[in-house]
Curated annotation (Swiss-Prot):
Subunit structure: Acetyl-CoA carboxylase is a heterohexamer composed of biotin carboxyl carrier protein (AccB), biotin carboxylase (AccC) and two subunits each of ACCase subunit alpha (AccA) and ACCase subunit beta (AccD).
Keyword Plastid: no
Pathway(s) annotated for this protein in UniProt: Lipid metabolism; malonyl-CoA biosynthesis; malonyl-CoA from acetyl-CoA: step 1/1
Catalytic reaction list: N(6)-carboxybiotinyl-L-lysyl-[protein] + acetyl-CoA = N(6)-biotinyl-L-lysyl-[protein] + malonyl-CoA
Binding of Zn(2+), residues: C43, C46, C62, C65
Keywords: ATP-binding, Cytoplasm, Fatty acid biosynthesis, Fatty acid metabolism, Lipid biosynthesis, Lipid metabolism, Metal-binding, Nucleotide-binding, Transferase, Zinc, Zinc-finger
Gene Ontology MF, one: carboxyl- or carbamoyltransferase activity
Name of the gene: accD
Annotated ranges, domain CoA carboxyltransferase N-terminal: 39-308
Annotated protein name in UniProt: Acetyl-coenzyme A carboxylase carboxyl transferase subunit beta
Enzyme Commission number: 2.1.3.15
Compartments reported by the entry: Cytoplasm
Amino acid sequence: MANNEESRGLKSLFDWFANRRKAGATNPERQEREIADGLWHKCSKCGVLTYTKDLRANQMVCVECGHHNRVDSDERIRQLIDQNTWRPMDENLRATDPLQFRDRKAYSDRLREMEDKLGLLDAVKTGLGQINSSPVALAVMDFRFMGGSMGSVVGEKITRLIEQATQRRYPVVIICTSGGARMQEGMLSLMQMAKISAALERHRDARLLYIPVLTNPTTGGVTASFAMLGDIILAEPKATIGFAGRRVIEQTLREKLPDDFQTAEDLLKHGFVDDIVPRTQLKNTLSQLIALHQPVPTTPPMVLWETMSLSSTAVE
C-alpha cells in the first residue's frame, strides 16, 4: 500500500515538472530567478524550460527542438574523452600585447578580464586522450574567450599539438568555434593560419587522419585555414559556417541571401562538409572514423631478390 502511494506521489511530481516545463512558470519573476540560479534553462529557439541537469545529460541539446546550445571547452572534453585519459598540453601559455593595441580598452586589460572571469588563459585547450580507447590529439576552442578568436597562443598551441600527434602517429581532432583571427594581434594573428596549415600538411604527409568538427559559429580566418583542411569535415546541425558575415555579404552584393546561407546544411548540400553529426552521436562517430583510418605500421620494404629467394625456397 505504501509503495503504491509512493509511486503515485512520484508520478504526480513528474507530471508537475513536465507541465511546468511546457507551460512555463506562471510567475515571471520566479521564472527569471530560477533561470538565473541555474536550475532551469530556457531554450533560445523554442522557449521551452528544461531542468539544467537533464539538459547536461543530453549534452546541452534541447530535448524538445534539438537546438545545440554552446558548450565550453571543459564540457566538450568531458563529452568526448574517456574518463581519466585526458593529458592537457601547454596549459601555461599566455598572450602578450606586442602591438600595445587599444580600442575601447587596452588589449592587456581584456586578457586579464577574460582570465579573471573564465579561468582561461586563451581561447583553446589542447591535449592527448582517448576516444572509446583510441588515442587522439584533441584541440577544443572556447567561444567565451574573446569570441574564440585565433591569436598567437591559439596558433602555437594547435601547432604544437599537431606536431606531437605527428610524432606519436595520432589522429588529430579540432573542435572549431571562432569569430576568426584576433584583430588585437594584427598580422601576428594572420600568421597563425599558415603556421597551423603547414603543421597539418606535415601531419598529412605522414598519412595520418585529421578531422575538424565545425560548431556554431565557425567563421573568418579559422574557416579560411585549418577548419576546411580536414580529411573528413564534420559539422553540428544548424551551425553557422562561413568567412565574412552575412550582413557584410548582403551589403556588398546588394542582394538578399537565402535563409539557409552559411548553415551546415547548406554547406553539406554544396559539398563543403562531409557530414552533419548531432552532438549526442559525435563521440561514437569519431571513434568509428578513427578505427577505420588506423595508420599502417611502417615496416621496411622487402627487396626483390629476397622475395625471389623466399619463393624459390618454398618451391623446393
